Amino acid sequence: MPNLANIDNPYEDQEQEAFVKWLDDNGYPRFRVPNETYTKSHKQRLKNKKLGVSSGVPDLAVVVPNTGTRRVYVETLDSDDSADYDQPISRLVFIEMKRRKGGVTSTNQKKWIKTLNEAGIQTVVCKGCDEAIEFIKSITK
C-alpha cells in the first residue's frame, strides 16, 4: 500500500490502491470491472463496445455486510432436507474514486451514478482513500 501521508494530492490510482488494500485487510470482498475505454486500436474499441465496455462505470464494487438477517426457507425434493434458516443480508455498493483535490466526475460517470442509485444500488463518489474508508464504516455501523 502506498504511504499517502506524505503526498499532498495523490493520484487517483494511488488512492484506489490504498483503499483496495484496506478493503482486503478488513475482509470486504470487492472487484473492479476492467472497463477502460481508451485504446489506440479502432478494432479493439469496436470489440470492447460489443463486449459491453461502457464509459463512466464506477471504479469499484464492494460487498458490504448489513447488520440484519432474513428468514429463508429452502425446500428440497427430499422434504427431510428442507429447512429454514437466517441468511445474513449483504449488499453491493459502487464507489467512484477521485483525487482529494481536483478530481472531476465526467458526464458519463454522473449518468452511471444516477442510474445505479435509481436502481437501488448505492453509488457514491469518494475523494481519496480516507473518504472511501469513512463511507464504508458509516454504512456498516
For each of these PLM feature ranges, what is it?
Residues 1-141:
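Catalytic phosphate/metal-binding cores of nucleic-acid and nucleotide-processing enzymes, i.e., regions
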